[in-house]
Amino acid sequence: VSVLTSRFVTPDPSNGYEPIRRYGNLRTGTGEPLNERMSLFEEIAYNVFERVYQDDEVAPPDDIIHVSCSGYLSPSPVQSYLSRRGWLAVGVTHSYHMGCYGAFPAIRTALGLIGSSHVSLPKRKRRVDLVHTEFLSLHFDLLGDEPDNFVTSTLFADGFIKYAAYPETEFGKTGQNGLRILALDERILPDSLPEMTLRPGPLQFDMSLSKRVPFMIRDSITDFVSAICEQAGLDFEREKGAMVFAIHPGGPAILNQIRAKLGIEESQVELSRKVLHEHGNMASATAPHIWQLVLQSPDIPVGAKVLSMAFGPGLTVIGALFEKV
């Protein structure tokens, strides 16, 4: 079963929260405790679900996959929304705490949900929605003067987005452009566990990103992208000049190192840079924002191959090969 993504919706969930006043200097303990931050996450995330499903005519999906690395509660915001909306038969999957690469395991889960229903279950799934709620500013140390804090506070940002996955037969009824999944792959890089971390602290989630990360990714990226392309019967070196690269912009250095290593043009990564420049690093919500631009761009024709990848704790390198349809 081929699964396609389409109909991206990007809400503005702002409700006037004041993080500097409410959270102060997190490292010296003058801010709110973690449970208070999770309460605000719950409020914002619930607001996101209300906005992305505000059309009364929209039919409920078979499943919703909720993706986040910045807030977790039980019951979750998606469960609260479904209960109040009366969509009680919608399946819920929580895809949490994977950081910047979280969109790809979520797509893999959607692929599994749809594929298994068409092979071994009596009820075939027609649509699986994926909703990202990344509220990273909730965890910033806005007053800290440590060098590492400058990186996290200026690089990371809030991001919210919804899109959908369909079996091929159902996608044709939407009348939308989409991305057909051709291949998926994932690797953990050796000897890299401490280079990127995301751990709960007493007041907030502590994020760390070492200077070695761009170079460790660079050294592994050629073999990785070649393996993805081989799954789809493509030769990377032969095809790369015509590809679009939707690379998660973990930072400018990561994009620079990958582009140089793969020998691709700056124009092939311009959408990644555009999202980083305009929105920052929104963790798991970043790659879907780039996919949205791919689908909206009149300069990227139907049939174009899109090689997308992201990186996170582990170090994990994960990616997908798409075809614009």
PLM region spans:
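Conserved beta-strand-centric core segments of catalytic alpha/beta enzyme folds
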Residues: 3-6, 60, 102-184, 288-325
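Active-site-adjacent elements of ketosynthase-type condensing enzymes
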Residues: 73-79, 130-151, 185-200, 252-260, ...
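Intrinsically disordered, low-complexity linker/loop segments enriched in Gly/Pro
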Residues: 77-90, 97, 121, 125, ...
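Short, well-ordered amphipathic alpha-helical segments that serve as non-catalytic structural scaffolds
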Residues: 1, 41-56, 109, 160, ...
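Condensing-enzyme catalytic core mediating Claisen C-C bond formation in acyl metabolism
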Residues: 1-38, 142-219, 223-227, 311, ...
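Membrane-interfacial loop- and helix-cap regions that link adjacent transmembrane helices
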Residues: 197-204, 208, 225-244, 249, ...
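Conserved beta-ketoacyl condensing-enzyme motif
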Residues: 2-85, 97, 235-255
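Claisen-condensing/thiolase-fold acyl-transfer catalytic domains that form or cleave C-C bonds
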Residues: 69-70, 88, 94-118, 218, ...
